[in-house]
Amino acid sequence: GLVNGLLSSVLGGGQGGGGLLGGIL
């Protein structure tokens, strides 16, 4: 997700691969 991806960018992981890429995708 966008929100989860952006927040996860700080943590270094998240939905869709994590990080900024995860936020965009």
Curated annotation (Swiss-Prot):
Q: Which domain of life is it from?
A: Eukaryota
By sequence similarity, the record places it as follows: Belongs to the frog skin active peptide (FSAP) family. Plasticin subfamily.
- Keywords, A to Z? Amphibian defense peptide, Immunity, Innate immunity, Membrane, Secreted, Target cell membrane, Target membrane
The organism named in the record is Leptodactylus laticeps
Entry's localization field: Secreted; Target cell membrane
Q: Output this protein's name.
A: Plasticin-L1
* Annotated function: May play an immunomodulatory role in frog skin in response to microbial pathogens, since it increases the production of the pro-inflammatory cytokines TNF-alpha, IL-1 beta, IL-12, and IL-23 by mouse peritoneal macrophages and has no effect on the production of the anti-inflammatory cytokine IL-10. It is not known whether stimulation of cytokine production arises from a non-specific interaction of the peptide with the macrophage membrane or from interaction with a specific receptor.
Broad class of where this protein is predominantly found: secreted
The record's GO CC annotations read:
extracellular region; membrane; other organism cell membrane
Which body tissues produce this protein? Expressed by the skin glands.
GO-annotated biological processes: innate immune response
Keyword flag Membrane = yes
Present the record's domain note: Amphipathic peptide that adopts a random coil conformation in water, a beta-sheet structure in methanol, and an alpha-helical conformation in trifluoroethanol-water. Plasticins have huge conformational plasticity. They can display random coil, alpha-helical, beta-sheet or beta-harpin structures.
